[in-house]
């Protein structure tokens, strides 16, 4: 966590060659992970790292679709990840995770404090899994997103079953509204997973980068993503 005179900021420098140990500043092999970026974070990204400001605007757009683009030597990938917001009218939605890469730099930006990212860091630290370059880290994040889709889909299904049991006893407007919100969550998930699938296809077609891919890891990503898609469709059809 980064500290300034203004307070605490969710900017972390995690060394991938040192079991994701947190550093005080960027150094080679560090992953810059920023959650809920502040104005100071934006200045750091655009002024110090020279990341195109258009990339940051795209990540800020809550409706931004999964895609990949390049500018000034930087590569931006937007992945839709699941997010649980109990204070929201619809408790399960998806939000953009921006992944920005260039040479030794690997930056992730999310405008929401998700369950996925801190869990991913803890998991990697606990398992002491090696990271072999930026693409390896990218695909591991991709894999983690699908795992979290499956976790939330299980929760959604459990909630749906509970609501249906209530409706069997007596039809109440409040329960019908809950069921509609659950269905909306499933629509969000299905749409985002389809977009992530399209992104994965584009990544696999990057011939100039394919030599840096771990084929076994990419296959794991494909399997988990397909499982999440199939599960979401099954729950939606029930």
Residue ranges: model-predicted function:
Residues 1-212, 217-220, 224-229:
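Peripheral, non-transmembrane regulatory/ligand-interaction domains of membrane transport proteins
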Residues 230-238:
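Membrane-interface, cytosolic juxtamembrane amphipathic helix immediately N-terminal to a transmembrane helix
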């Amino acid at each position: 966590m980064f500290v300034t005179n203004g307070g605490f900021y969710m900017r972390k420098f995690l060394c991938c060659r040192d079991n994701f140990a947190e550093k005080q500043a960027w150094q080679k092999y560090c992953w810059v992970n920023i959650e809920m970026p502040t104005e100071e974070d934006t200045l750091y990204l655009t002024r110090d790292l020279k990341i195109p400001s258009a990339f940051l605007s795209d990540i800020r757009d809550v409706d931004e679709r999964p895609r990949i683009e390049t500018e000034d030597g930087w590569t931006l990938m937007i992945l839709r990840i699941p997010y649980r917001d109990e204070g929201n009218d619809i408790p399960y939605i998806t939000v953009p995770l921006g992944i920005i890469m260039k040479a030794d730099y690997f930056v992730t930006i999310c405008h929401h404090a998700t369950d996925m990212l801190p869990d991913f860091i803890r998991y990697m630290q606990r398992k002491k899994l090696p990271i072999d370059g930026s693409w390896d880290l990218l695909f591991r994040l991709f894999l983690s997103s699908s795992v979290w889709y499956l976790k939330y889909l299980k929760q959604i299904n459990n909630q749906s079953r509970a609501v249906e049991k209530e409706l069997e006893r007596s039809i109440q407007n409040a329960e019908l509204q809950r069921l509609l919100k659950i269905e909306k969550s499933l629509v969000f998930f299905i749409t985002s997973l389809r977009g992530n699938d399209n992104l994965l296809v584009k990544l696999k077609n990057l011939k100039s980068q394919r030599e840096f891919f771990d084929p076994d890891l990419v296959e794991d990503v494909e399997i988990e993503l397909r499982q999440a898609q199939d599960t979401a469709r099954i729950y939606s059809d029930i």
